[in-house]
């Protein structure tokens, strides 16, 4: 069986200054060849980058309920615990704007049931741990604290997408500079920059575990992004060594 020739991959190309010998159609059909609008020389390169962003927010919900023979008793029981939770959170450095309380009151046969849910948003995960540990220690089993739900704000995701794209552009520019330097030219301004692909995914390696540490939950919720761009740069004339003055 004949040996297969290795496939050559063109990652950058230079257009000659005088391209009249080649037809425009031939140039456009060749991978990596770019036809300059004004007959100038250009270099076209690809660039890629990959970054990750850990979640910047977490939400914990604290459920409180009480069933009593009278409505006043049920409301009073829940209200006392809500006041303690609010006081503990304030002392733990949580501001009012990050606390949301919802209440529901029901009559079941001869009893009254009062339920309340306190949802708390944390941007400091050390505060999250210390506040939750304190509430678990101080409150009885009638209070249920949900596992933290980690997520990304829109600003965090936009920053990740912007930075990974800029990283890909920077890598493409470095590649173009190296190509130009190799052939004795210098790199000019960017003519075209186009993002070809943007991918995002999460690390699901440990998501099936029933009980995870805070660090494992953060790792599982981390979002990864990869960007690939194509860029065309102007090529300047050959480099000349500066004369010593």
Curated annotation (Swiss-Prot):
Signal peptide: none annotated. One of its GO terms (biological process) is positive regulation of canonical NF-kappaB signal transduction. The keyword Nucleus applies. It comes from the Eukaryota. This is Interleukin-1 receptor-associated kinase 1-binding protein 1 homolog. Gene3D superfamilies: Protein of unknown function (DUF541), domain 1 (3.30.110.170), Protein of unknown function (DUF541), domain 2 (3.30.70.2970). It comes from Xenopus laevis. It is found in: Cytoplasm; Nucleus. InterPro entries: IRAK1BP1, SIMPL/DUF541. Keywords: Cytoplasm, Nucleus. Belongs to the IRAK1BP1 family. One of its GO terms (cellular component) is cytoplasm. May be part of a signaling pathway that leads to NF-kappa-B activation.
